[in-house]
Design a protein with these regions (language model features):
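Membrane-embedded helix-loop-helix hairpins and adjacent transmembrane boundary segments
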Residues: 1-510
């Protein structure tokens, strides 16, 4: 029964990929779905790209163990800051300006907005380098649950996930990814809700589980009774950094903001904002809420020996075979949707912003699409190999890999990208300063971590600080560096002043 459900799911994904081939004949169609994707598909694509095994297995387990039920604040932050505010602040302006500048990727936006080829190439290099750790972490989270449910070797899990994702992305591009994301999102919503009910029921219900959690003590963390069932948990400061990284970070991630490029119209943005927020509240809030009860299983979990990534699989190990199958498909859905977004963002960036820009300026449309497809294969292959290497190395925490990736990307791009949509004063120098600061800080954190202040030794905290520092750095550097080309700036912002006729059902008029 478990295998039947799995193969049925695989068949649907591949079928959709083949069905969407007609939408992937040119660069605009392959990368952005022709900028005609509706609110439900866009919102679910955003949500499923946001939450993967990194959240469900890595973050929910680790932070639920560290902060107890207070870890749920991370899920609430993901919904309010990472989804609601991201759509409100970035969605509309980004859709308008990126279409006006004819940019399909984040580096292309920087290149057109600031009239800088080096800026475009620099951004593309950062994206390719730092998305790799994130993709490697996706496989690891999946392998633990696959091994528990089907007793399949880890290498088989990697090959299976890689091949399936490659097939439907190569065949149907962004549109296939968006439709599959919608199906995967429904599975995630149903799955997380069902699993929470089942786990709490196994512990006597919510009140009994909460009472049990309140009785858990850990002198190495805090001596206060009931700390793991408290409102802010044992370590509010570090919890705040988790909320910042996982919530604000989405504003600067290329695979996330690219969803706004493809949205169809004004009405779709309004609906998508609500749908995306509710999706995040259920999936992220539910995952962290579930992880908050991890210490009820402390008699069966050896964090020192098996790592935090073993917590959620242990919590789910007593569920029925059908529910375990649902869990596996849930995490598979989350991971594949995120992986597909990452490889589309990476391969399109390398083709459009690196290869075409530096080596093949006259590359034809069909060859660009072919290049993107080939790079999808290359990127998935590289991430698969790294996942195997990482599995056998000393880096065992999924959350740490994600912290490095998110910290470097969002630390580099969040501030210059957001300010460039709103301010005419942002300079190229301020963008470079943020690029170099964010990426260099995270690389230094990998190799020289013991020399960092204690609060910054965690890549999660370091990534959050990189983002916040960028928000301060860009305006300050812009004040003291040469002003941008006024004609270029006025042309970019002219898109907001263009007149558009709409029907009375959209606007009341005079």
């Amino acid at each position: 029964m478990k295998l039947l459900l799995l193969f049925l799911y695989f068949g649907v994904l591949i079928g959709i990929g083949l069905y969407c081939r007609k939408h992937a004949t040119d660069v605009n169609g392959f990368v952005l779905g022709g900028r005609s994707v509706g609110p439900w598909l866009t919102a679910f694509a955003y949500g499923t790209s946001y939450f993967s095994a990194v959240v469900f297995v890595g973050y929910a387990g680790q932070f639920g163990w560290k902060y107890g039920l207070a870890a749920t604040w991370a899920g609430i932050g993901n919904a309010i800051i990472g989804s609601l505010l991201a759509w409100v602040v970035l969605g509309r302006r980004m859709r308008i300006m990126t279409q006006h500048l004819d940019s399909a990727t984040m580096p292309q936006f920087f290149g057109e907005r600031f009239g800088s080829r080096p800026l475009k190439v620099g951004a593309s290099v950062i994206i390719f380098v730092f998305l790799i750790p994130y993709t490697a972490s996706l496989y690891n989270g999946l392998s633990r649950l696959f091994g528990m449910a089907f007793h399949i070797d880890y290498s088989v899990c990697i090959v299976l996930m890689a091949v399936l994702t490659a097939i439907y992305v190569i065949a149907g591009g962004y549109m296939a990814t968006a439709i599959n994301d919608f199906i995967q999102g429904i599975i995630m919503l149903l799955g997380i809700s069902t699993i929470i009910v089942a786990v709490l029921k196994s512990k006597g219900g919510f009140m009994a589980a909460l009472d049990g959690l309140a009785r858990v003590t850990d002198e190495s963390v805090a001596s206060t009774p009931g700390i793991f069932a408290s409102f802010f948990g044992p370590d509010p400061l570090n919890l705040l950094f988790v909320v910042i990284l996982t919530s604000l970070g989405t504003w600067g991630l290329p695979q996330m903001v690219q969803k706004f490029y493809a949205i169809k119209n004004e009405e779709s943005i309004k609906k998508g904002t609500i749908i995306s927020t509710l999706f995040a509240l259920v999936v992220a809030g539910g995952s962290y809420f579930l992880g908050g009860f991890g210490r009820l299983y402390s008699d069966r979990i050896d964090v020192n020996a098996n790592g935090f990534d073993s917590i959620i699989p242990t919590m789910l190990s007593d569920l029925s075979p059908i529910l375990i199958s649902l869990v596996v498909i849930l995490v598979l859905s989350a991971s594949m949707s995120t992986l597909s977004s990452l490889v589309i963002a990476s391969s399109s960036t390398l083709t459009i912003d690196f290869l075409k820009e530096l080596f093949f300026p006259k590359m034809e449309e069909k060859k660009q699409v072919l290049s993107i497809r080939l790079l999808v294969v290359v990127f998935i292959a590289i991430s698969s190999v790294l996942a195997l290497i990482q599995y056998k190395s000393s880096v065992t925490f999924i959350a740490q890999l994600m912290g490095v990736s998110w910290g470097a990307l969002a630390g580099s791009f969040l501030a210059p990208f957001m300010y460039a949509l709103y301010s005419k004063r942002v300079t190229k120098a301020s963008c470079w300063a943020c690029f170099l600061f964010g990426s260099t800080l995270m690389v230094a954190n990998i190799f020289f971590r013991p020399y960092f202040p204690e609060v910054m030794q965690s890549p999660i905290n370091c990534g959050a600080i990189a983002m916040l520092a960028g928000l301060v750095m860009v305006p300050i550097v812009s004040v003291f560096t040469p002003k941008p080309n006024q004609k270029l700036v006025e042309d970019a912002f002219a898109c907001y002043e263009k007149k558009t006729e709409v029907s009375r059902k959209t606007s009341l008029g005079k």
